[in-house]
């Protein structure tokens, strides 16, 4: 219910009320009524004070006076007259304060209105209208010293409003005459603002920002921003753009060093010219908006931006923006451009432009950058970028490629092929880098795959290694899988667009799904982890289906930091979605908390794990190899809280009254290696955490009340567990009877804990 006022840097003052926007510059006042999001375009009214005459005297008016802002009032000081606009939520009150010293006779004020709307009289004054809506210009009044309002003759002559003040009112004005008409929307559209293409990014300590495209008309889209707390409460809002420039497909990212957000969008500053515009802002108690600027002022057209930020605290960090690029006048065919922006909003360096030698009609399209570039040292810090190669032909195959983007651009490094087979690959999304130690520098690429001729669309995922602090590792694809089974999607349904991010440990995937029986759409959200170099479902996954006829457009992991300032996994994700109903389009948002710490694997003969060494297969999934007591194989599970440091491990289905050792490894070996009568999937540095004797029921738990926690025990053994690290646990135990196997010990299935 408040009027928004902005000075975006175009030498005009802008205001937006509940049903109008207006701009004020040296060219005069421009009023743009809201006729509904489905209006084909804007229908503005441009007001220009043309003349004021008193008797035979014409007042000298300064037609180039600048607009001045004071609270909710805009004033033009035009010599002997002040032209004023008082801004209210549903109307604008125009007034003219005229110095009448020495004037006599009737006074005539002429105001030219440049508009496509048709003007006509009604009982209230003048109405400008078309089939989409109407704007009223009320009969003007003179405000007398007593406060009484004297109606004035207000007429329309062609495109000129004429307001006549009788001579006696001029004489009685005591040197100052106030003429006061009101501009407002006299018939509201039946629908409100439609919202499209929301995006989300995270700042620090759980705060997050949404940006969304607001449709003012079919040729004028605005961009709004909202700041939400960790508790899902809207803290503040900001209007990133509500000028008459068309802004579409907004993206948002955060720079921790400057503590500024950057929003970018595909904009059209002039007819037929598309550029990527950006604007920085802060959203604290003393929020600030910085001037709008073009990231791509060069020749050619620029479309479909994607944006990455940097959550590292040191100086010199940047944002990265990549967009589609079409330059028909350039000597070579260019298809993509990258721009780097400093934390304070300056373009850094030349960026990069890709002008590949592609077959005629083929283009790189739909780029997708990761939200952040990880926590590696700056020399080995990368954003992940996925993009499609399209032939431009309908129903043709598309291929999906990947590059890593360091500061300054990718240089001559060759791209990776993520999916180069037959079929249609689209809607790619790239997570922020995840992992620690040897597992660091990994990103998840999620995308939609549709068979060329028949079959349901599905979501696929690729785990890509883009580097780590200890090496200059070349990029490599570690694993590719259909994500349906990992995230719990329904195979018989159609999966559509997906989006992904990482909190530095695991990944989250949000996707749209269409029920093939009812044609209803919904959104699924789930977490995915890694076991070694393989993608795996995350234990304790949270799945959320919120609403129908929606598609996810953005997901962002909430950033969390330890007392020392080091990042720690938050297990919290912010999801933005576009919602469509029978009448309008809007947005939905959700905050997902993914509580799963445990991932279960290493059941021999299932998944990636090799079969048992001597035909002693487990009786069911989640068991280790069968033992001589024929329990079906030992199983291991986890429980407790990371926050309370109360994680405990419980083994069951072991041999009764047997010696058992709780084992920790810092590397997962998904295939397993033969270990006694079973398969060991815990690798790397192995620690014996505890020795136990199983119960008569073949059970054992570690730790129990009074014992050090697993984290404290590992630290005492010289192997501290950093936040975000993964450790693998198994229990091996005495199994001396033969049962067809030569060894005298066996081992449970494995549980991976995300610390």
Residue ranges and their predicted role:
Residues 595-755:
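Residue-level hotspots within well-ordered secondary structure
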Residues 74, 94, 107-111, 152, ...:
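Hydrophobic residues positioned within well-ordered beta-strands of beta-sheet architectures
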Residues 96-103, 202-203, 434-437, 639-642, ...:
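Extracellular and analogous surface-interaction loops
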Residues 120-124, 397, 459, 657, ...:
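Short coil-to-beta strand junction motifs in C2/discoidin
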Residues 101, 169-170, 312, 713-722:
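Short, surface-exposed loop/turn segments at beta-strand-coil junctions that are enriched for proline
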Residues 1-184:
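Residues that cap or anchor secondary-structure elements
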Residues 107, 117, 138, 221, ...:
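Short beta-strand/loop motifs in extracellular/secreted proteins, especially
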Residues 1-7, 11-14, 18-24, 182-595:
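Extracellular, repeat-based ectodomains that mediate carbohydrate processing or recognition
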């Amino acid at each position: 219910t408040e009027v928004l006022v902005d000075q975006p840097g175009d030498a005009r003052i802008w205001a937006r009320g509940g049903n109008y926007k207006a701009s004020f510059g040296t060219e005069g006042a421009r009023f743009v009524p809201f006729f509904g999001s489905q209006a084909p375009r804007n229908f503005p009214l441009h007001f220009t004070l043309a003349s004021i005459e008193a008797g035979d005297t014409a007042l000298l008016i300064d037609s180039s006076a600048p607009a001045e802002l004071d609270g909710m009032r805009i004033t033009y000081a035009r010599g002997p007259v002040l032209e004023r606009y008082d801004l209210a939520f549903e109307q604008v009150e125009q007034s003219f304060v005229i110095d009448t010293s020495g004037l006599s006779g009737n006074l005539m004020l002429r105001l030219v209105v440049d508009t496509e709307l048709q003007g006509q009289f009604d009982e209230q004054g003048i109405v400008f209208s078309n089939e989409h809506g109407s704007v009223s210009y009320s009969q003007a009044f003179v405000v007398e010293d007593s406060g009484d309002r004297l109606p004035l003759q207000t007429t329309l002559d062609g495109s000129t409003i004429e307001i006549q003040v009788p001579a006696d009112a001029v004489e009685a004005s005591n040197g100052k005459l106030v003429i006061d008409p009101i501009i407002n929307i006299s018939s509201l559209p039946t629908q409100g603002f439609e919202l499209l293409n929301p995006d989300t990014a995270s700042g620090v300590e759980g705060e997050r920002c949404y940006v969304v495209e607001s449709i003012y008309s079919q040729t004028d889209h605005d961009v709004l921003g909202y700041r939400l707390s960790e508790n899902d409460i809207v803290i503040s809002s900001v209007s990133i753009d509500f000028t008459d420039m068309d802004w579409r497909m907004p993206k948002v990212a955060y720079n921790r060093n400057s503590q500024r957000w950057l929003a970018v969008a595909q904009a059209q500053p002039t007819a037929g010219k598309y550029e990527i515009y950006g604007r920085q802002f802060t959203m604290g108690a003393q929020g600030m908006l910085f001037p709008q600027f073009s990231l791509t002022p060069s020749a050619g057209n620029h479309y479909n931006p994607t944006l990455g930020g940097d959550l590292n605290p040191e100086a010199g960090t940047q944002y990265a923006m990549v967009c589609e690029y079409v330059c028909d006048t350039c000597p070579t065919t260019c298809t993509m451009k990258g721009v780097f922006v400093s934390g304070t909003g300056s373009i850094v360096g030349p960026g990069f432009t890709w002008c590949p030698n592609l077959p005629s009609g083929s283009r790189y399209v739909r780029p997708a950058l990761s939200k952040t570039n990880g926590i590696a040292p700056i020399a080995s810090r990368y954003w992940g970028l996925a993009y499609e190669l399209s032939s431009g032909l309908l129903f043709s195959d598309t291929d999906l490629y990947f590059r890593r983007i360091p500061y300054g651009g990718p240089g001559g490094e060759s791209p990776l092929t993520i999916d180069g087979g037959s079929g249609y690959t689209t809607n790619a999304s790239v997570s922020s880098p995840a992992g620690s130690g040897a597992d660091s520098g990994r990103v998840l690429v999620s995308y939609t795959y549709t068979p060329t001729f028949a079959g349901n669309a599905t979501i696929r995922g690729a785990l890509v290694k883009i580097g780590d602090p200890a090496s200059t590792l070349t990029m490599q694809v570690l694993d590719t899988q259909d994500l349906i089974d990992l995230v719990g999607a329904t195979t018989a349904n159609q999966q559509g667009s997906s989006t992904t991010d990482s909190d530095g440990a695991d990944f989250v995937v949000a996707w749209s799904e269409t029920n093939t029986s009812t044609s209803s759409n919904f959104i699924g959200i789930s977490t995915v982890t890694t076991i070694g170099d393989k993608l795996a479902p995350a234990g304790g996954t949270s799945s959320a289906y919120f609403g129908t006829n929606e598609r996810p457009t953005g997901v962002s992991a909430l950033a969390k930091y330890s007392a020392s300032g080091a990042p720690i996994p938050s297990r919290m994700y912010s999801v933005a979605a576009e919602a469509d109903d029978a009448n309008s389009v809007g947005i939905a948002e959700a905050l997902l908390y993914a509580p799963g710490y445990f991932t279960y694997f290493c059941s021999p003969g299932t998944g990636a794990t090799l079969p048992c060494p001597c035909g002693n297969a487990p009786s069911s999934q989640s068991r280790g190899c069968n033992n001589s007591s024929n329990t079906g194989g030992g199983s291991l599970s986890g429980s407790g809280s990371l926050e309370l440091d109360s994680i405990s491990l419980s083994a069951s289905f072991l041999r009764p009254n047997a010696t058992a050792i709780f084992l920790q490894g810092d590397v997962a070996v998904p295939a397993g290696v033969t270990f006694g009568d079973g398969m060991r999937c815990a690798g790397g540095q192995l620690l014996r955490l505890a020795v136990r004797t199983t119960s008569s029921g073949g059970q054992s738990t570690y730790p129990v009340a009074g014992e050090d926690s697993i984290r404290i025990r590992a630290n005492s053994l010289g192997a501290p567990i950093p936040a975000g690290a993964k450790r693998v646990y198994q229990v091996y135990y005495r199994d001396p009877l033969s049962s067809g196997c030569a060894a005298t010990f066996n081992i449970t299935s494995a549980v991976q804990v995300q610390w």
